[in-house]
């Protein structure tokens, strides 16, 4: 993985801490750049500046609008994880990405442990979480309900200590559409991490960690994860949520 590391902020020490923590190495020939400004950490595709920058922002913009005016418990992901009545499952989001589905779940009351294996994406996610924790409106519930795990892969979680009611998986899958039709964020992400070609390997550790169910979000044209037929699926316009029920008893 190659990336340029650019500091446009006045805080050189913070920039170096980010690079050291995530073990990032500057490559001046890379077309992707991780940039620290005085406001945020962001990802840019230098050969396509019109795409704009990608950053994690839970405080305002699209995510704030979704929290205030979205479907809440009625959102497809909330239904898929089994939210019903007073039941708010604990969740491991094993492919956290930019944390958007996790934020929906946290906004309705679920506690979510976020796992992200790509260090650049994890750095962006952590930056967004830190800013959200400091926000007077959402900071308190964010600190309680959205936590970034210390490990980068769910296979490293302790089944005895860190199992959850639900393990949620949304692995990257190749798009059918031509790249020009794919939204800017996905185009940059595809260049950064590509498809999760080894995503079948998530299934066994996910089942081990899930007390109630494993939920896998897939494009409607994608095969079942690890060729495992789900107990049932919930479909939306372009996606489906494959649900695998667990027989583990709660401790």
Swiss-Prot record:
Organism name: Actinobacillus pleuropneumoniae serotype 5b (strain L20)
Enzyme Commission (EC) number: 2.1.1.242
Reaction equation(s) it catalyzes: guanosine(1516) in 16S rRNA + S-adenosyl-L-methionine = N(2)-methylguanosine(1516) in 16S rRNA + S-adenosyl-L-homocysteine + H(+)
Entry keyword set: Cytoplasm, Methyltransferase, rRNA processing, S-adenosyl-L-methionine, Transferase
Record family assignment: Belongs to the methyltransferase superfamily. RsmJ family.
Molecular functions per Gene Ontology: rRNA (guanine-N2-)-methyltransferase activity
Annotated S-S bridges: none
Cellular component GO terms held in the UniProt record: cytoplasm
Protein localization: Cytoplasm
Record keyword Cytoplasm present: yes
Role summary: Specifically methylates the guanosine in position 1516 of 16S rRNA.
Pfam families in alphabetical order: SAM_MT
Protein's UniProt name: Ribosomal RNA small subunit methyltransferase J
Signal peptide: none
Chain positions recorded as S-adenosyl-L-methionine binding sites: 100-101, 116-117, 170
């Amino acid at each position: 993985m190659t990336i340029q590391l650019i500091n446009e902020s006045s805080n050189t020490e913070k920039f170096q801490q980010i690079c050291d923590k995530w073990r990032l190495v500057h490559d001046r020939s890379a077309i992707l750049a991780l940039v620290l400004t005085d406001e945020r950490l962001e990802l840019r595709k230098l050969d396509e500046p019109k795409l704009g920058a990608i950053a994690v922002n839970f405080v305002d913009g699209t995510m704030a609008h979704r929290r205030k005016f979205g479907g809440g418990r009625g959102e497809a992901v909330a239904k898929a994880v089994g939210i019903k009545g007073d039941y708010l499952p604990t969740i491991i989001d094993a492919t956290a990405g930019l944390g958007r589905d996790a934020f929906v779940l946290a906004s309705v009351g679920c506690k979510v442990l976020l796992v992200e294996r790509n260090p650049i994406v994890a750095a962006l996610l952590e930056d967004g979480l830190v800013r959200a924790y400091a926000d007077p409106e959402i900071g308190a519930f964010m600190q309680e309900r959205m936590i970034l795990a210390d490990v980068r892969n769910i296979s490293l979680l302790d089944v005895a200590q860190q199992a959850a009611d639900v393990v949620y998986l949304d692995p990257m899958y190749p798009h059918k559409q031509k790249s020009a039709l794919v939204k800017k964020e996905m185009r940059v992400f595809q260049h950064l991490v590509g498809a999760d070609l080894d995503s079948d390997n998530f299934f066994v550790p996910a089942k081990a960690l899930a007390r109630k169910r494993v939920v896998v979000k897939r494009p409607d044209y994608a095969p079942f994860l690890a060729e495992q037929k789900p107990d049932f699926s919930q479909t939306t316009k372009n996606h489906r949520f494959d649900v695998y029920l667990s027989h583990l008893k709660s401790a």
